[in-house]
């Protein structure tokens, strides 16, 4: 990336402790090598744990063992989560087989598909970190900037049916990912064993990021209407593909300022949907990334991490001022945004045939967890498919997987393996379950306040019973759960959203847009399951009785008065008492 002449970052002594740590880290090297070599603990130092995030690694521990290990005077059961950088969620069969091999060797026989179209390994011990990352390197994968205060993994619509258009957009998304990540010589030295090169010989280590990188994480995504599978309005920087009448790519509408994270009882924090500010041709995408990220680098809040995301930078300085600064850095004005429409943010499950005649099958992976379960050997089945598949795999933003680019001759073999391992969702799987999504949460995530991945399938089963009672079992309703308010599953744009507050207690949100175009609003705070189901029973019964033709549940919740529509992120935390016969807002 090109540096700018307008770096407004303050000197590190005036900034937060995290900013000072980055500045003093020797470009993210810290003492990571020393921590890795320490045989007396399964952890790394506190400062190195923060720096490891830039390397795509989170230090965690098994929270279910904490009390027992404390009684035994043992340190926590430390382990690490590793997140792969996978632009647009595309990987080859050879890469899938290597990921499977590493998961079995070091990751507890489990792979986790994420809401940003990549893989996570959990349960990796410290002494296995280098072997895991070196194994990824063997198939040209890495974990650079998968976490940390930088440009995170770049997303791209996973629908392969639009073959030529998808290929054009994906190619630009991949270029943006390669361009936006830090240069990270530290990564090459620590994990791949490369020798350090003197800065005077190779130029500045980080010509764009400098010593303090970005104030917080920065998320970029590319979407191809009419499917908003990446939830483009939740991205810091979103590119909405615009195709001409001939289906060829004309360029992108640019959306800025989305983000989900918030903190309970902190009204100054809130989710925000991105604003569309204009249009750029394909050749201006990389420059637009530089300009937008440069504004956040130079104007983002480096004193208060809770207010450091780009969405707050926009709200503090004003959208018009931020757009003007982006255009100043670009050296040209954005063109007016062009018309587009979205109609869903879900996946087209099952078999599809693309424009080029190639076949693709999208498999439902509940909450993205690939393990071998009794009667459902997901990990095993997909490994066997990867052994014979000549095309690619694509991870969707809904934590599902597409087996893509299947030829006519190959299809019968793939179909046979799908039947053998029972990998396709049956007709009895409800539309609600197919549109459900949860973050990992307990027992590994250190931020989780309540269950998510392990609990949502059970809760969905109870809501399914309500849907059957009211004749709504085939109605597509989006439901998302996060174990804390940070919102990794993007719950604040779901028609039914839940975020953990304490063990067994959740905030319940209603009224999100079916294709991610509207934030929802809280209707129950710190509520137990019984109160959640009671309120949903009331609203679903009302929906079944009084909905309009084609009206989605989230739209109905707003129209019927259960929630007032959120028109701006800063309005999200203003409580609105539910109406239309709903229960009280606290339970």
UniProtKB/Swiss-Prot annotation:
Keywords of the record: 4Fe-4S, Amino-acid biosynthesis, Cysteine biosynthesis, Heme, Iron, Iron-sulfur, Metal-binding, NADP, Oxidoreductase
Gene3D superfamilies linked to this entry: Sulfite Reductase Hemoprotein, domain 1, Sulfite Reductase Hemoprotein,Domain 2
Its EC number(s): 1.8.1.2
GO molecular function terms attached to this record: 4 iron, 4 sulfur cluster binding; heme binding; metal ion binding; NADP binding; sulfite reductase (ferredoxin) activity; sulfite reductase (NADPH) activity
PROSITE patterns: NIR_SIR
Annotated residues for binding of siroheme: 488
Cellular component terms per the entry's GO annotation: sulfite reductase complex (NADPH)
Residues bound to [4Fe-4S] cluster: 439, 445, 484, 488
Cofactor(s) annotated in UniProt: siroheme; [4Fe-4S] cluster
One GO BP annotation of this record: cysteine biosynthetic process
Catalytic reaction list: hydrogen sulfide + 3 NADP(+) + 3 H2O = sulfite + 3 NADPH + 4 H(+)
Comp. bias (Polar residues): 1-13
Pathway: Sulfur metabolism; hydrogen sulfide biosynthesis; hydrogen sulfide from sulfite (NADPH route): step 1/1
The keyword Heme is annotated on this UniProt entry: yes
Region (Disordered): 1-20
Pfam families: NIR_SIR, NIR_SIR_ferr
Entry annotated with the keyword 4Fe-4S: yes
Cofactor binding note: Binds 1 siroheme per subunit. Binds 1 [4Fe-4S] cluster per subunit.
Family matches, as NCBIfam families: CysI, PRK13504.1
HAMAP family reported for this sequence: CysI
PANTHER family: SULFITE REDUCTASE [NADPH] SUBUNIT BETA (PTHR11493:SF47), SULFITE REDUCTASE [NADPH] SUBUNIT BETA-RELATED (PTHR11493)
Biological role stated in the UniProt entry: Component of the sulfite reductase complex that catalyzes the 6-electron reduction of sulfite to sulfide. This is one of several activities required for the biosynthesis of L-cysteine from sulfate.
Subunit structure: Alpha(8)-beta(8). The alpha component is a flavoprotein, the beta component is a hemoprotein.
The family this protein is said to belong to: Belongs to the nitrite and sulfite reductase 4Fe-4S domain family.
Protein name: Sulfite reductase [NADPH] hemoprotein beta-component
Organism: Bordetella petrii (strain ATCC BAA-461 / DSM 12804 / CCUG 43448)
Lineage: Bacteria, Pseudomonadati, Pseudomonadota, Betaproteobacteria, Burkholderiales
């Amino acid at each position: 990336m090109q540096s700018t002449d307008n770096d407004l970052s303050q000197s590190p002594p005036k900034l937060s402790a995290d900013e000072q740590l980055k500045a003093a880290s020797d470009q993210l090297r810290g003492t990571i090598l020393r921590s890795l070599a320490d045989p007396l603990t399964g952890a790394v130092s506190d400062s190195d744990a923060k720096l490891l995030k830039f390397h795509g690694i989170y230090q965690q521990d098994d929270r279910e063992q904490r009390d027992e290990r404390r009684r035994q005077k043992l340190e926590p059961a430390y382990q690490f989560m590793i997140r792969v950088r996978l632009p647009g969620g595309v990987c080859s069969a050879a890469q899938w087989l290597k990921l499977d091999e590493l998961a079995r060797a070091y990751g507890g026989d489990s792979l986790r598909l994420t809401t940003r179209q990549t893989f996570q390994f959990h349960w990796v011990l410290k002494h296995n970190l280098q072997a895991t990352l070196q194994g990824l390197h063997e198939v040209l994968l890495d974990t650079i900037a998968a976490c940390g205060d930088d440009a995170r993994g770049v997303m791209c619509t996973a629908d392969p049916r639009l073959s030529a258009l998808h290929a054009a957009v994906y190619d630009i998304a991949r270029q943006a990912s390669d361009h936006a990540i830090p240069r990270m010589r530290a990564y090459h030295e620590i994990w791949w064993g490369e020798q350090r090169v003197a800065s005077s010989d190779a130029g500045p280590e980080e010509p764009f990021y400098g010593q303090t990188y970005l104030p917080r994480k920065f998320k970029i995504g590319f979407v191809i209407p009419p499917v908003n599978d990446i939830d483009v309005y939740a991205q810091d920087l979103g590119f909405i593909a615009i195709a001409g009448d001939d289906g060829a790519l004309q360029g992108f509408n640019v959306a800025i300022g989305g983000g989900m994270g918030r903190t309970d009882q902190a009204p100054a924090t809130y989710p925000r949907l991105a604003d569309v500010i204009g249009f750029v041709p394909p050749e201006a995408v990389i420059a637009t990334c530089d300009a937008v990220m440069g504004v956040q680098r130079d104007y983002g809040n480096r004193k208060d991490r809770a207010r450091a995301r780009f969405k707050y930078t926009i709200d503090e300085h004003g959208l018009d001022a931020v757009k003007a600064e982006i255009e100043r850095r670009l050296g040209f004005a954005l063109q007016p945004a062009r018309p587009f429409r979205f109609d869903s943010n879900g996946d087209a499950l099952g078999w599809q045939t693309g424009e080029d005649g190639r076949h693709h099958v999208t498999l439902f992976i509940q909450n993205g967890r690939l393990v071998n379960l009794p009667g459902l050997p997901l990990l095993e089945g997909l490994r066997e498919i990867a052994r014979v598949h000549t095309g690619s795999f694509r991870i969707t933003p809904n934590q599902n997987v597409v087996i893509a680019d299947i030829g006519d001759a190959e299809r019968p073999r793939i179909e046979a393996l799908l039947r053998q391992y029972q990998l396709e969702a049956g007709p009895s799987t409800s539309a609600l379950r197919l549109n459900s999504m949860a973050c990992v949460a307990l027992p590994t995530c250190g931020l989780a306040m309540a269950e998510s991945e392990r609990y949502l399938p059970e809760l969905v089963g109870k809501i399914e019973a309500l849907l059957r009672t009211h004749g709504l079992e085939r109605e597509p309703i989006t439901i998302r759960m996060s174990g804390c308010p940070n919102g990794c599953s993007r719950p604040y744009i779901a028609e039914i959203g839940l975020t953990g507050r304490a063990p067994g207690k959740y905030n319940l949100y209603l009224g999100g847009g079916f294709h991610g175009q509207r934030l929802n609003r809280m209707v129950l705070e710190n509520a137990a399951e019984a109160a959640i189901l009671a309120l949903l029973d009331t609203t679903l019964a009302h929906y079944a009785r009084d909905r309009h033709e084609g009206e989605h549940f989230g739209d109905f919740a707003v129209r019927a008065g259960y929630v007032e529509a959120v028109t701006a992120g800063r309005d999200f935390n203003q409580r609105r008492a539910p109406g239309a016969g709903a229960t009280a807002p606290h339970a």
